Amino acid sequence: MSHTLKSKTLQELDIEEIKETNPLLKLVQGQRIVQVPELVLESGVVINNFPIAYKTWGTLNEAGDNVLVICHALTGSADVADWWGPLLGNDLAFDPSRFFIICLNSMGSPYGSFSPLTINEETGVRYGPEFPLCTVRDDVRAHRIVLDSLGVKSIACVIGGSMGGMLSLEWAAMYGKEYVKNMVALATSARHSAWCISWSEAQRQSIYSDPNYLDGYYPVEEQPVAGLSAARMSALLTYRTRNSFENKFSRRSPSIAQQQKAQREETRKPSTVSEHSLQIHNDGYKTKASTAIAGISGQKGQSVVSTASSSDSLNSSTSMTSVSSVTGEVKDIKPAQTYFSAQSYLRYQGTKFINRFDANCYIAITRKLDTHDLARDRVDDITEVLSTIQQPSLIIGIQSDGLFTYSEQEFLAEHIPKSQLEKIESPEGHDAFLLEFKLINKLIVQFLKTNCKAITDAAPRAWGGDVGNDETKTSVFGEAEEVTNW
C-alpha cells in the first residue's frame, strides 16, 4: 500500500510522463518514483534532481522501526511480489501485516531509478552511454535519502541476494547496528571476484560487438538486441549448473508447443541442398530482415538470413525433408538433430530479456557489480571490514553456485561476528536464491522471529495491496517459468 510521507518530503514524479521516455516502466505496476535533489557519487560526480523508484507493502509503525528493506538483484525491479512473491504475505518471511516492506530500485536499472534511460536536464536527451558510474555504495546512500523522507528511523532487517546481497552488506557496514538492526545476505560476496568480473566483461563484449550498439548512442527502439540477447544467454549459463541443464534438457527436442510456434512462423522450407545446409548452419542467427530463408542457389550477393527457430521442423526426430540435390534430383533427407531444447530455452530467454531490458543499463549495472569491494577505500584487509558488521546476520549459500561460490558465503560467515550460515542443497546453481522459495522463506522467518521478536510477536495489522506470486507463476523479473514457454 502507499505510505504517506512524514518528513523531508521528496517531490513525487508523474510516472505516466516518464513512461513517454522510458517504455520499460510499464512492466512495474504500483511503484512510486520520487525526485532526489542532490547526491555526490563516489566518483565525485554530482547528480541533481534524479529519480529513485520504490514499492512498499504494509504500514510503517509510529516508531518508524518495523522496516524490511529488500534489495533486488542485477536485472530485478522494485516489485518483490514478482520475483520473490512466494515470500510475501501474511505469516511469510515478508509479512506486510507486521512489517513495512520496501524495495528500492538500484541506479542504472531501467525500471524507474536514475539510469541511462533518464533524460539529462542539461542536454534534453537520455544519458545513454554518458551515464555516470554508480556504485553499490551510491545506491545505499541514495536509498537512505528516500527512507528518511518516509519517516524511517531504523531498519529492522535488510535482505538481498546476489547484487542485492552486496547492498545488504553495504547497508550493514555503512550505517552500523544502530540504524540497521539485522542483515540477511544470500548468494553474494564481500568483493566481486575475478571470475565474476570476467563474465561481466564477456557479456559487455557481446553487446559491444553488435553493429547496432553505435557506442551506446542507439535509438531506444533500435537497441542492439542481438548483443543483449547473447549477453543474457551467457549470463544464464553462469546462473545454473551443468547438471541442472542436463537434468532439465538432456538432448531432447524443443517442446511440441515451441515446434508448433516455429512452424507457424516459418515462411517456407528450403528447396535445395544449398538452402537446407544454409538453414542448419545459420540457425539461431537473426538480422532485422530475418523473416524467411532466402535461397542462394550459388548466387553471389543475395541476402541470406535465417529465423532463430526455423530448424525445428528440420531437426525433429521424425522429420523427413524433401529437397533438391545438387544434381537436380529430388530425394528425402533426414538430418542428424542439430536443434535441442537447451538451445530453445536460451533463445526464449534471450528474446524475453530484450523485451524487458536496455543494453546501456545492462552495461551500467554490470560495471556497478565490478566496483563491489567492502574493503575498497576503507582498509586493506577485507576481514577487518567484515569484523565491523556487528548486526545479527544470516548468510545463505548455495552448494552448487558456481558464480558466488559457497566458499565465499563461508568466508562471510567466518568473519562477520554474529552470523549464522545456512546451506541450500540445490542443483540449480546461483539461481536457486530465486527458485528455492520454501526453504528460503523458512530460514528468514526463523531468523526474524529470533531477532525481530517485538515485531513478529506483535498483533497483525490489516493492510491493502497486492500479495506475492504463486511459485509456479511465470515471473517478469525472476526465474520462475512455465516450461511450455520453451
UniProtKB/Swiss-Prot annotation:
<feature type="active site">
    <location>
        <position position="401"/>
    </location>
</feature>
<comment type="similarity">
    <text>Belongs to the AB hydrolase superfamily. MetX family.</text>
</comment>
<dbReference type="Pfam" id="PF00561">
    <property type="entry name" value="Abhydrolase_1"/>
</dbReference>
<keyword id="KW-0963">Cytoplasm</keyword>
<feature type="active site">
    <location>
        <position position="430"/>
    </location>
</feature>
<keyword id="KW-0808">Transferase</keyword>
<keyword id="KW-0486">Methionine biosynthesis</keyword>
<comment type="pathway">
    <text>Amino-acid biosynthesis; L-methionine biosynthesis via de novo pathway; O-acetyl-L-homoserine from L-homoserine: step 1/1.</text>
</comment>
<feature type="domain" description="AB hydrolase-1">
    <location>
        <begin position="66"/>
        <end position="436"/>
    </location>
</feature>
<dbReference type="GO" id="GO:0000096">
    <property type="term" value="P:sulfur amino acid metabolic process"/>
</dbReference>
<keyword id="KW-0028">Amino-acid biosynthesis</keyword>
<feature type="region of interest" description="Disordered">
    <location>
        <begin position="248"/>
        <end position="281"/>
    </location>
</feature>
<dbReference type="GO" id="GO:0004414">
    <property type="term" value="F:homoserine O-acetyltransferase activity"/>
</dbReference>
<feature type="active site" description="Nucleophile">
    <location>
        <position position="162"/>
    </location>
</feature>
<dbReference type="InterPro" id="IPR000073">
    <property type="entry name" value="AB_hydrolase_1"/>
</dbReference>
<dbReference type="InterPro" id="IPR008220">
    <property type="entry name" value="HAT_MetX-like"/>
</dbReference>
<keyword id="KW-0012">Acyltransferase</keyword>
<feature type="compositionally biased region" description="Polar residues">
    <location>
        <begin position="250"/>
        <end position="261"/>
    </location>
</feature>
<feature type="compositionally biased region" description="Polar residues">
    <location>
        <begin position="270"/>
        <end position="280"/>
    </location>
</feature>
<comment type="function">
    <text>Commits homoserine to the methionine biosynthesis pathway by catalyzing its O-acetylation.</text>
</comment>
<dbReference type="InterPro" id="IPR029058">
    <property type="entry name" value="AB_hydrolase_fold"/>
</dbReference>
<dbReference type="GO" id="GO:0009092">
    <property type="term" value="P:homoserine metabolic process"/>
</dbReference>
<protein>
    <recommendedName>
        <fullName>Homoserine O-acetyltransferase</fullName>
        <ecNumber>2.3.1.31</ecNumber>
    </recommendedName>
</protein>
<dbReference type="GO" id="GO:0005737">
    <property type="term" value="C:cytoplasm"/>
</dbReference>
<dbReference type="GO" id="GO:0009086">
    <property type="term" value="P:methionine biosynthetic process"/>
</dbReference>
